[in-house]
């Protein structure tokens, strides 16, 4: 037995254990379900774009102003699904401060609040497409995606006599590249964001102080801010926040400026 063990030790080559291969990330295809996020920082720099979103520009997608690096311009955008009195307060502040906003609306918001939509338009704000029904667009077929955009387009035209601005934002940031290809085909730029925070739950609102700190800590030149206009906190802090940011040298731009549409 000792002889056999000795022979085996000679015949079997000595080597280090083979290291396990690192796990590979699944390839992102046009049909991969994605959820928007960015890698924020506290140095007031444009957040880093995660690798899975590297194709964004190919689909006419935006999340921050990368065309004017370092310029202290901000973009206020609001996802408006319904009204609880605070959308009107937000509009009052924007009018008082002479600041433009972009409102991404649903069909329900338009049918329930036609006067507010007319006010947005008459006061120079951009009214944009947040889809007709606020579905998870990562699960939508090409045809369903197309209908979500065109149904709201048609309703908007019927109710206002105007065309909705060709800016699209996926509900809850859920999407797949196939969606954005359809949006691009229909003439839309897709607008994500570089800053958002937990402001949507009416029964779990952040305190005004905490909200201002969160925004100020994460602000950066070229930021696209996503705010929910139903938020009581947002309605309270917006006048102060605008003054604060303007005093720090920021100004507020429009989505046409962000995307370069006004320059075309």
Outline where the language-model segments fall:
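Catalytic grooves of carbohydrate-active enzymes
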Residues: 219-256
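Short catalytic/ligand-binding loop motif for oxyanion handling, primarily in non-cytosolic enzymes
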Residues: 175-178, 233-234, 261-263
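Metal-dependent polysaccharide deacetylase catalytic core of the NodB/CE4 family, i.e.
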Residues: 71-74, 84-86, 91, 95-209, ...
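Hydrophobic alpha-helix-in-membranes signature
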Residues: 12, 16, 165, 169-170, ...
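N-terminal pre-catalytic segment of deacetylase/amide-hydrolase enzymes
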Residues: 5-77, 83-96, 210, 241-244, ...
